[in-house]
């Protein structure tokens, strides 16, 4: 009885601080790609979005699926959960900012850079990526910070066989259960840097980079 009273008092204290939490809302089903216009911000306010598999794709490894979100140059996507099916996740056309976006079950890819630019990813997470999380299809830079990834093939992959330059950085993150590598390229000019990151069950940090094109510091294997 005393234990039960303590639990009730604790629950009451939490409720008084945070208020009564409503039941989780049903995911928003996206029938056609949500376009975030140039220079604007889309704040999902923590809501979950899933693709309509009939119109966007079923989140398998099938090519040419459509994205749930399309970001035009300079756009920002934040506070979004992308559930399953995720189709082809997020497409960035030029510079884009991704803040606190979680991919619960990565589809074809979590995010693809479709035209040259810089992708800044801060916070968030990605899980269950059969192949790659972030696909880079154009010259540019991808900066990833404070990110969590688990059960993935690769974290960052430059489009296979391409020779353009991609600069990849990963900082203060936690990466685990990787099948291939954290960063992979086939380009002799691309660069990769991993700092202050914890990782576990990762075969290799870098794959395909030319000599002298990778660096690391402050990382911890666990």
Swiss-Prot record:
Presence of keyword Secreted: yes
GO biological process, one term: pectin catabolic process
Membrane-crossing residue ranges in chain numbering: none
Pathway field: Glycan metabolism; pectin degradation
Pfam families: Pectate_lyase
Substrates-to-products reaction catalysed: Eliminative cleavage of (1->4)-alpha-D-galacturonan to give oligosaccharides with 4-deoxy-alpha-D-galact-4-enuronosyl groups at their non-reducing ends; Eliminative cleavage of (1->4)-alpha-D-galacturonan methyl ester to give oligosaccharides with 4-deoxy-6-O-methyl-alpha-D-galact-4-enuronosyl groups at their non-reducing ends
Thermal behaviour (record text): Optimum temperature is 45 degrees Celsius.
Keywords: Calcium, Carbohydrate metabolism, Lyase, Polysaccharide degradation, Secreted, Signal
GO MF terms held by the record: calcium ion binding; pectate lyase activity; pectin lyase activity
Activity vs pH: Optimum pH is 10.5.
Cell compartment(s), UniProt: Secreted
Purpose: Catalyzes the depolymerization of both polygalacturonate and pectins with low (20-34%) and high (90%) levels of methyl esterification, with an endo mode of action. In contrast to the majority of pectate lyases, displays high activity on highly methylated pectins. Does not show xylanase and cellulase activity.
Similarity-based family: Belongs to the polysaccharide lyase 3 family.
Record's protein name: Pectate lyase A
Record lineage: Bacteria, Bacillati, Bacillota, Bacilli, Bacillales
Gene for this chain: pelA
């Amino acid at each position: 009885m005393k234990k039960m009273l303590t639990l009730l008092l604790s629950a009451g204290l939490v409720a008084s601080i945070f208020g009564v939490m409503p039941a989780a809302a049903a995911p928003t089903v996206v029938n056609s790609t949500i376009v975030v216009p140039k220079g604007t911000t889309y704040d999902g306010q923590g809501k979950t979005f899933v693709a309509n598999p009939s119109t966007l794709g079923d989140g398998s490894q099938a090519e040419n699926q459509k994205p749930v979100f399309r970001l035009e140059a300079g756009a920002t996507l934040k506070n979004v959960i992308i559930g399953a099916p995720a189709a082809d996740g997020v497409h960035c056309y030029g510079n884009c900012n991704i803040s606190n976006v979680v991919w619960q079950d990565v589809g074809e890819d979590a995010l693809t850079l479709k035209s040259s630019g810089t992708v800044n990813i801060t916070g968030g997470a990605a899980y269950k990526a059969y192949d790659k999380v972030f696909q880079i299809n154009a010259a540019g830079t991808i900066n990833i910070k404070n990110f969590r990834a688990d059960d993935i093939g690769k974290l960052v992959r430059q489009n296979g066989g391409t020779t353009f330059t991609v600069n990849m950085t990963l900082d203060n993150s936690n990466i685990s259960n990787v099948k291939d590598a954290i960063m992979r390229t086939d380009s002799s000019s691309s660069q990769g840097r991993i700092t202050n990151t914890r990782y576990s069950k990762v075969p290799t940090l870098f794959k395909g980079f030319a000599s002298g094109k990778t660096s690391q510091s402050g990382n911890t294997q666990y």
